[in-house]
Amino acid sequence: MGRAFEYRKARKMKRWGNMARVFTKLGKEITIAAKEGGPDVETNPRLRILVQTAKKENMPKENVERAIKKATSKDYTDYKEMNYEGYGPYGIAIFVETATDNTTRTVANVRSYFNKHGGSLGTSGSLEFLFQHKCVFHIVKKDDMDLESLELELIDYGVDELEEDENEIILYGDFSENSNIQKYLEDAGYEIASAEFVRIPNDTKEVTAEQREQIEKLIERIEEDEDVQNVFHNMKEEEGEE
């Protein structure tokens, strides 16, 4: 489950081409978290993890500080987090997460992307059941780590899958367990390199190379929109990427 998500994420980062898009997305998340839970990372767990994620992505410290200050400034932009769901070409389910200061503009734009690329925007919540909403934690791997023991240790706190990467361990849990997992990892002294929320499809749909090209054009167009934070889909990855 998780490995395919990591491949999708890597391809998305490659499509974005430069870090400016990543910084914009993270900046919005940081501002929203600081507005909701306060600007102090010591008392705001969500902000704390986002700042750590920004560090991993090499986001400049001044960008992070500016995003936090934006939450308490008189010029604060009131972002609303809205989800849009629809079907792309060939029945591929697409779930779009946005953070916008103008929902009328955003929904009109997203609908136009679907329409122009052979898809259709559905009603809110209509496709949510096709995806598992997960929290993902990347923790720094230590030489003496026993993965089997670690998995048994973490299962009581909501972790339901664990994967080993080159320099880190990737943990997956249900979205609702995010706070429990983060608190335990921090209290137990694990170093969290980054964390994020994802939607992983329950099942994936096979497509031809030509169909894939058409679907990816729609996904790329949606991702280019500045209001869009994440795009998830249930198209099966190409051979060798599962």
Curated annotation (Swiss-Prot):
Its main location: cytoplasm. InterPro entries: Integrase-like_N, TACO1_YebC-like_2nd/3rd_dom, TACO1_YebC_N, Transcrip_reg_TACO1-like, Transcrip_reg_TACO1-like_dom3, YebC-like. It is found in: Cytoplasm. GO terms for molecular function: DNA binding. SUPFAM superfamilies: YebC-like. Keywords: Cytoplasm, DNA-binding, Transcription, Transcription regulation. GO terms for biological process: regulation of DNA-templated transcription. It comes from the Bacteria. One of its GO terms (cellular component) is cytosol. The keyword Lipid biosynthesis does not apply. Belongs to the TACO1 family. HAMAP family: Transcrip_reg_TACO1. This is Probable transcriptional regulatory protein PG_0097. It comes from Porphyromonas gingivalis (strain ATCC BAA-308 / W83).
